[in-house]
Amino acid sequence: MSRFPAVAGRAPRRQEEGERPIELQEERPSAVRIADREEKGCTSQEGGTTPTFPIQKQRKKLIQAVRDNSFLIVTGNTGSGKTTQLPKYLYEAGFSQHGMIGVTQPRKVAAISVAQRVAEEMKCTLGSKVGYQVRFDDCSSKETAIKYMTDGCLLKHILGDPNLSKFSVIILDEAHERTLTTDILFGLLKKLFQDKSPNRKEHLKVVVMSATMELAKLSAFFGNCPIFDIPGRLYPVREKFCNLIGPRDRENTAYIQAIVKVTMDIHLNEMAGDILVFLTGQFEIEKSCELLFQMAESVDYDYDVQDTTLDGLLILPCYGSMTTDQQRRIFLPPPPGIRKCVISTNISATSLTIDGIRYVVDGGFVKQLNHNPRLGLDILEVVPISKSEALQRSGRAGRTASGKCFRIYSKEFWSQCMPDHVIPEIKRTSLTSVVLTLKCLAIHDVIRFPYLDPPNERLILEALKQLYQCDAIDRSGHVTRLGLSMVEFPLPPHLTCAVIRAASLDCEDLLLPIAAMLSVENVFIRPVDPEYQKEAEQRHRELAAKAGGFNDFATLAVIFEQCKSSGAPASWCQKHWIHWRCLFSAFRVEAQLRELIRKLKQQSDFPRETFEGPKHEVLRRCLCAGYFKNVARRSVGRTFCTMDGRGSPVHIHPSSALHEQETKLEWIIFHEVLVTTKVYARIVCPIRYEWVRDLLPKLHELNAHDLSSVARREMREDARRKWTNKENVKQLKDGISKEVLKKMQRRNDDKSISDARARFLERKQQRIQDHSDTLKETG
């Protein structure tokens, strides 16, 4: 199991009388501490102690700006206090008298952490005056006045209350990240004010907060609304390009050794100050922690380290699937004489601020969800970060003192491989879920919806087609009763479709654990250490064997049921190398999905079906109802080809129980694809062709344009234009033909033929005469 957090260094020095033992110092329990250590706190009206922030000098002006404008853009450097202080100011100014102050975050970790921080500052219990809501977890009450939530949760609020009558202020935070849901919220809020709905609250205010973004463009989108700039307080940060990655290495992400080397060089050669390292995901982070620990263990602190006050290195991972308690540790001061090193995903670039960071190691890459048009699927890829993201990362080193940023890539990589800004998610991912949401909000014209950056029309039409294939919309593009039910589920449409199909057969118990497991982080622990790795793989194979050894979906169900039924689930997870936190989340998800299904089945018109057959067949048939777009047939050897019309080759991922059994298979369905050296299908199960025979034609039978009223109207107009042009060409051809016919008729009468013959004989006689004259001259 993971040994981190852990301290690598020499044995602790003898404890002096009155000195605290070396441990994480939790005398300041706040979840996030941003203020400078030397500055004194100030007391809020709620009685809590609040650190000093740059935003405090702008408090009165900022409150007045919110009062005076329906839309306001607030910009300032990360750490200026926007996220934690502005909602408090508005609460203390009385805005919550007209409704809640809602604050969105793109990530649930940030929503929870910031809510904890603000609740501590306001001296209240989390869930009372200050609460949060993330997917599958609502920690709020009727008393809640400030509610932090993911942007997806606000979208769910709009589904039930399009006029947002329960809110007085909506704050869209971290707008520069341009998530898909945030962009949709931009359009919905703009439309809410444009339509001037009679039920809209007059007091509703919208604040958009961004650290780095095209502010003029955003202001123009919201009717040239004012931009309120909070002057920053950043210390200078020196940048160093380490030149370990160049433009040719854009596709090569095997850079862990380089990251660890640079980090260790900082620890040995730089003065005291904590280190923040940016990597792309959990596997890279855990591997780097292990390698860094091994190197730090061999350091002689009497000779190797330039700063003699240092006795060790505290290594702390930070990624989304960690527990809240584990995440809290990264914000606590390290023990005396110990340097803290946080190895994190991109979440620490903007959403969270860690005090004491003086050195940043920028790995230059991030995991990003991109739509692959060749496969017709969204794929999580490792790509270079943007220049704006790189500046965000380096800014973390200049929060409390001057700092340094070590970029492992070269200047050429910066200029040639890194875009200026983040590509908005709406322009690079599937739109299926949000298009369904818009349809359920009676926004039928999804093509001309007010987007800040309009997505490619192809992505919209593809989303419409997928919704039709799931029976969420009809051939006219109108949402169906099933579609209205599907939008209530916090699942992708295809997975929701499979769950509802199972419910109609009264076998939802088979699908709900699987749906819950697919909704959380990867549950399998795959350690870096080779010895532990073999043990983990053996345990995972045993679990797959209990599910029949031939169905990855069923393996997830077995893990869910066995862990839940064990007397000590945490110990069971440790024994089987499974993430207990992920399983615990899956239990909560399954309970909420079960409640949604219960309410759905109470409806009088809910369809009921019967099927006589073994459970394993019912399970796979229900999966086919939602995953028939992800059907593949074996072509040659171990290669499969998708059946969606693209015929893309895919291979079964090595982690699957079906890996190396490909020759026994003919047809499969899969949950997702992963692109590395090959295109791999993950979470796979075998099926029979007859189960999808009637479903596959839906992938091809309808033109996507038919599902959009606007597209249909444009197609009709285009068809009329083409028909008119065709008729004009036809008439032109007819006119030409008639003229040619007249000429032919004139040429074919007796007189014309006689005249033509006479002209031919005359020309022939002339040629004979010319030839005779030539012979005489030469003779």
Curated annotation (Swiss-Prot):
Residues 42-53 have a biased composition (Polar residues). It comes from the Eukaryota. Residues 1-53 are annotated as: Disordered. It is an enzyme of class 3 (hydrolase). InterPro entries: DEAD-box_helicase_OB_fold, DEAD/DEAH_box_helicase_dom, DNA/RNA_helicase_DEAH_CS, HA2_WH, Helicase-assoc_dom, Helicase_ATP-bd, Helicase_C-like, P-loop_NTPase. Residues 263-442 form the Helicase C-terminal domain. Residues 63-231 form the Helicase ATP-binding domain. Keywords: ATP-binding, Helicase, Hydrolase, Nucleotide-binding. The keyword rRNA processing does not apply. The keyword ATP-binding applies. Coiled coil: none annotated. Pfam families: DEAD (PF00270), HA2_C (PF21010), HA2_N (PF04408), Helicase_C (PF00271), OB_NTP_bind (PF07717). ATP binds at residues 76-83. GO terms for molecular function: ATP binding; ATP hydrolysis activity; nucleic acid binding; RNA helicase activity. Residues 13-41 have a biased composition (Basic and acidic residues). A motif (DEAH box) lies at residues 173-176. It catalyses: ATP + H2O = ADP + phosphate + H(+). Its EC number is 3.6.4.13. PANTHER family: ATP-DEPENDENT RNA HELICASE, ATP-DEPENDENT RNA HELICASE DHX40-RELATED. Probable ATP-dependent RNA helicase. Belongs to the DEAD box helicase family. DEAH subfamily. This is Probable ATP-dependent RNA helicase DHX40. It comes from Mus musculus (Mouse). The gene is Dhx40.
